[in-house]
């Protein structure tokens, strides 16, 4: 990719609309303005002008905006044509611009990439642009704006600065071992390291919430046939998404519903009843059910309350619980409380959450909704929250691992050189979030997922 080229792309969605925008960025943007507008508009003022073809005829007329670099989104000279949103008109205008030498169609995300490369925004902020466009809820959109304004980046940069300060002390202890003050053993480095680890844990917790807000929580409903799994899916979805009958094994395949609970996206997955398969189709359905369970963020273990009084999942179905990943959160849902007369509500039983409800009548469903929010650490008040991606979580986790290893080197061996290296690696992992340290491959993967005009 040649970043010295002047690029152009449509910045509005394809199709018919009231307004269509073409964006130009690069050194030849001023030349484009002279040839199509007949003049260079006043910087940052809206000029109503005809857009001219090569023969002088008018292709369209509309608003022209001129942003000379470096005071523009990309940091380069930027020109925008805001005309009528007909696809034919926009195509003619685009062809006219591309007929000029040195111009080409922008690659996906190239405008944002140039803004990043020209230090107009960091990598986390650039990703927030795409997240804001793709936001599926009001809370996700607000958190994306926070990320775009630098809330997440500021938290990360504070951690990086703290590590820089800590590394200065450690490097001094290594370089000047004969000094009267032993920086490694006087407790100051240990105290600072503990504080950085604590602050990083807080950022990781907020980032996990931001990731859930962006990507959604995968909740799998599992259990024996006829426990009420499909009825629960319908109750949570608020519509008849799944067929419900008294015939065991009605659900043969995986059913998915995407819902929001107070702005938090959930992917609710209904699975085939787990039992010895009676035919090949059911066997495949059960295999798929286990695949979904093993990939879940949370499992709702549906139990027909009329068949057992047990509340401990290990007593209800020990083989099922034994097969689950140890770290997977499981909530036991005792269904048919309208028949058994059980009190609706949530309680803790032997390390598992237990909810009594009726999927058929809807009693207790709100308790389940509230439980799903709280079990994932989600708070309805996330004014200062930010969105995070999986790569951000991985970088934060890697940084935490290096800090814990550095702590071990400090406390167990007083190994200053090894501690310094772990601090450097932690700092490098954090710097990947904002793009201060990043590979070309990483940048390519991130910006290739953007819209063309961004």
Swiss-Prot record:
Cellular compartments annotated: Cytoplasm
Residues that coordinate or bind GTP: 226-231, 245-251, 270-273, 335-338, 358-360
Cofactor binding note: Binds 1 potassium ion per subunit.
InterPro entries, per database record: G_TrmE (IPR031168), GTP-bd (IPR006073), GTP-bd_TrmE_N (IPR018948), GTPase_MnmE (IPR004520), MnmE_dom2 (IPR027368), MnmE_helical (IPR025867), P-loop_NTPase (IPR027417), Small_GTP-bd (IPR005225)
Gene3D superfamilies noted in UniProt: P-loop containing nucleotide triphosphate hydrolases, Probable tRNA modification gtpase trme, domain 1, tRNA modification GTPase MnmE domain 2
Keywords assigned by UniProt, alphabetized: Cytoplasm, GTP-binding, Hydrolase, Magnesium, Metal-binding, Nucleotide-binding, Potassium, tRNA processing
Binding locations of K(+): 226, 245, 247, 250
Primary localization class, coarse: cytoplasm
Signal peptide range in chain numbering: none
Limits of the TrmE-type G domain: 216-377
Cysteines engaged in disulfide bonds, as pairs: none
Pfam family, any one: MnmE_helical
EC number: 3.6.-.-
GO (cellular component) term, any one: cytosol
Binding annotation for (6S)-5-formyl-5,6,7,8-tetrahydrofolate: 23, 80, 120, 454
Cofactor: K(+)
GO molecular function: GTP binding; GTPase activity; metal ion binding
GO terms (BP aspect): tRNA methylation; tRNA wobble uridine modification
Binding-site list for Mg(2+): 230, 251
Record-linked PROSITE patterns: G_TRME
Subunit structure: Homodimer. Heterotetramer of two MnmE and two MnmG subunits.
Summary of the function given for this chain in its UniProt record: Exhibits a very high intrinsic GTPase hydrolysis rate. Involved in the addition of a carboxymethylaminomethyl (cmnm) group at the wobble position (U34) of certain tRNAs, forming tRNA-cmnm(5)s(2)U34.
Family, similarity comment: Belongs to the TRAFAC class TrmE-Era-EngA-EngB-Septin-like GTPase superfamily. TrmE GTPase family.
Name of this protein: tRNA modification GTPase MnmE
């Amino acid at each position: 990719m040649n970043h010295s080229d002047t690029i152009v792309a449509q910045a509005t969605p394809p199709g018919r609309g009231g307004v269509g925008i073409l964006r130009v960025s690069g050194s030849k943007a001023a030349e484009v303005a002279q040839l199509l507008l007949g003049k260079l508009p006043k910087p940052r003022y809206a000029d109503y002008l005809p857009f001219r073809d090569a023969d002088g005829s008018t292709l369209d007329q509309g608003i022209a905006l001129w942003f000379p670099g470096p005071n523009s989104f990309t940091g380069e000279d930027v020109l925008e044509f805001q005309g009528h949103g007909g696809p034919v008109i926009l195509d003619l205008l685009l062809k006219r611009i591309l007929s000029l030498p040195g111009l080409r169609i922008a690659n996906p995300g190239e405008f944002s990439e140039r803004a990043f490369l020209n230090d107009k925004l960091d990598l986390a902020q650039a990703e927030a642009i795409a997240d804001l466009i793709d936001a599926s809820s009001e809370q996700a959109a607000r958190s994306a704006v926070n990320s775009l304004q630098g809330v997440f980046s500021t938290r990360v940069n504070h951690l990086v600065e703290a590590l820089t300060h800590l590394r200065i002390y450690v490097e001094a202890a290594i370089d000047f071992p004969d000094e009267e003050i032993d920086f490694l053993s006087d407790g100051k480095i240990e105290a600072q390291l503990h504080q950085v680890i604590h602050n990083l844990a807080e950022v990781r917790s907020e980032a996990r919430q931001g990731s859930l807000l962006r990507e959604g929580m995968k909740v799998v409903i599992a259990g024996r046939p006829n426990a009420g799994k499909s009825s629960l899916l319908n109750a949570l979805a608020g519509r008849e998404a799944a067929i419900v009958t008294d015939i065991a094994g009605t659900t043969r395949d995986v059913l998915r519903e995407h819902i929001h609970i107070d702005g938090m996206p959930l992917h609710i997955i209904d699975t085939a009843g787990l039992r010895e398969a009676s035919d090949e189709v059911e066997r495949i359905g059960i295999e798929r059910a286990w695949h979904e369970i093993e990939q879940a963020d949370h499992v709702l273990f549906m139990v027909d309350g009329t068949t057992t009084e047990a509340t401990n999942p290990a007593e209800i179905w020990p083989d099922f619980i034994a097969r689950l990943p140890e770290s997977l959160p499981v909530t036991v849902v005792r269904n048919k409380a309208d028949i058994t007369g059980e009190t609706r509500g949530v309680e803790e039983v032997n390390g598992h959450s237990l909810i009594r409800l009726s999927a058929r009548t809807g009693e207790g469903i709100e308790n389940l909704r509230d439980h799903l929010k709280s079990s994932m650490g989600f708070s309805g008040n996330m004014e200062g929250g930010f969105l995070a991606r999986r790569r951000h979580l991985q970088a934060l986790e890697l940084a935490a691992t290096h800090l814990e290893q550095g702590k071990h080197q400090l406390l167990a061996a007083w190994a200053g050189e090894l501690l310094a290296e772990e601090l450097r690696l932690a700092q490098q992992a954090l710097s990947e979030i904002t793009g201060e340290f990043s590979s070309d491959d990483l940048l390519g993967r991130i910006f290739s997922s953007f819209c063309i005009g961004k």
